[in-house]
């Protein structure tokens, strides 16, 4: 009898583009695709925690669309404009879980250690600091003080932390990072800074894919969310992103290669 292949699900960062991840996962659920491991960066960490706790995406969609997400934004003073902890606490209240070992599916979350210029990986202990660190975009969210180090958004080290799923056989990536950013001769200083970060992120993704494509079966679900802001709070637009995620997942999973890999 053939050994069942282990499936890893890797969820990228991307701010409010995470609504498209919810849509894509709804399709995975309909195909009864259950990951053995979930890896999340930034918003992917939040979506991943909810999925790892065993919640269905239809219920998550209802909870989010019925919540005033703007009230979770807590202005602050210091090395960031917003405290991200309220967002993490909302996620934990929703899933009624506070520690990694209480989750139903193994979860790994990444963050960036600014103090030591390296990646931090969370898979044990309390979820709150891990989630808060992973979503803390520098300059917008206050960094998390963890063991006297400052931690920020995991996407600044690796927005698609594919390497954290290398012990899996099949890796499904849901990428909503939207690295299609372009600058023009009229672009300002902030645009140029953003493009520099995007170029670095693209290079890291390319190197990761090259390193794993020969040893793993990889499926990529990449909803086109380029026309949506990473800070999209309009409900109608959030619903549109969920639909985009569903449509792209159906397209990818309907492909002959994907069906063969997943045994559909």
Regions found by a protein language model. Give the residues of each.
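Patatin-like phospholipase
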Residues: 1-41, 49-264
């Amino acid at each position: 009898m053939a050994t069942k292949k282990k499936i890893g699900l890797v969820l990228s960062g991307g701010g409010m583009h995470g609504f498209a991840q919810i849509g894509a996962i709804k399709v995975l659920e309909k195909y009864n695709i259950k990951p053995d491991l979930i890896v999340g960066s930034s918003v992917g960490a939040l979506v991943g925690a909810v999925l790892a706790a065993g919640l269905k995406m239809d219920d998550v969609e209802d909870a989010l669309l019925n919540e005033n997400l703007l009230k979770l934004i807590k202005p602050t003073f210091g090395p960031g404009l917003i405290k991200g902890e309220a967002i993490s606490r909302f996620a934990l209240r929703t899933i009624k879980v506070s520690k990694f070992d209480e989750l139903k599916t193994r979860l790994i979350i990444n963050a960036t250690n600014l103090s030591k210029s390296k990646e931090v990986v969370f898979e044990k202990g309390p979820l709150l600091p891990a989630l808060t660190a992973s979503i803390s975009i520098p300059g917008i969210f206050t960094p998390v003080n963890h063991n006297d180090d400052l931690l920020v958004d995991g996407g600044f080290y690796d927005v698609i932390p594919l390497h954290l799923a290398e012990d899996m056989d099949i890796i499904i990536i849901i990428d909503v990072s939207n690295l299609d950013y372009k600058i023009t001769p009229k672009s300002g200083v902030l645009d140029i800074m953003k493009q520099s970060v995007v170029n670095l992120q693209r290079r890291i993704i390319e190197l990761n894919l090259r390193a794993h494509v020969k040893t793993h079966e990889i499926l990529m679900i990449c909803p086109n969310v380029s026309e949506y802001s990473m800070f999209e709070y309009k409900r109608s637009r959030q619903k549109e992103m969920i639909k985009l995620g569903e449509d792209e997942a159906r397209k990818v999973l309907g492909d002959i290669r994907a069906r063969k890999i997943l045994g559909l």
